[in-house]
Amino acid sequence: RLSFDGQAYQVSVPDLATASDWTGALMFLKTLLVLLDVSVCEHDGVDYDKDSILDFHFTDIFLSALSELTKEVKVHPIVEIMGVKRPIYINELYLGQIIHVPDDQLLNSYDQRLRFTQQLNAYYSEQQVFKIEQNGEDIIIPINYLNSEGRTILPSQPELEPQYLQEYRGSKVAVARLFIMTADGEKLAELPYREFLESLTEGIYMLDAKYVLVDPISPEMLQKLSQK
């Protein structure tokens, strides 16, 4: 994040930023020092110029923040951290997959996993909610859509999304549904959400603590699902 208070520019990098993000920020800062023809910026009492700014040691900052995150996921089921394009949700299982590597591979493991969540070319399935009335009672039906022809990001649990919880408080929630669609909007199949996810033995990957990535659905798989 770049800010200017009228006297000085400030470049802020989250403590849990990836090594790639840190490197990019330091390269940008070096360019800024050159363009503004200034020679010194200060961090914790240490001076850096355009020739030494790339030597800034961010590793200690990152490792300290990662240690705090490790403690936090033991207290909270899911911890949300900031991403470039979308938030990243972390729990003990997901964090364990990242950090249980040799020490010299930790930065790269963290970098690759988090960048993958941000740079992924996939359809992000946003939940829609439909309300019907049955016997004088409001019933809420959560629905997600899966693109049969491309990779799709889906919530890992068939739950009502937080933005709908207050709006439909007190309403009965029906079994969440999944519509399998073509890229042109044709519905190919409709399935119970949880049943679909549990039926996948391949082509499904943990994206983070709240979302999974599902590969395109083959005609054979689609036929099998349609027969259920």
Predicted regions located by residue number:
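Generic surface-pattern signal
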Residues: 34, 71-75, 227
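Short, intrinsically disordered low-complexity segments
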Residues: 1-23
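Acidic, low-complexity cytosolic segments
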Residues: 21-46, 50-53
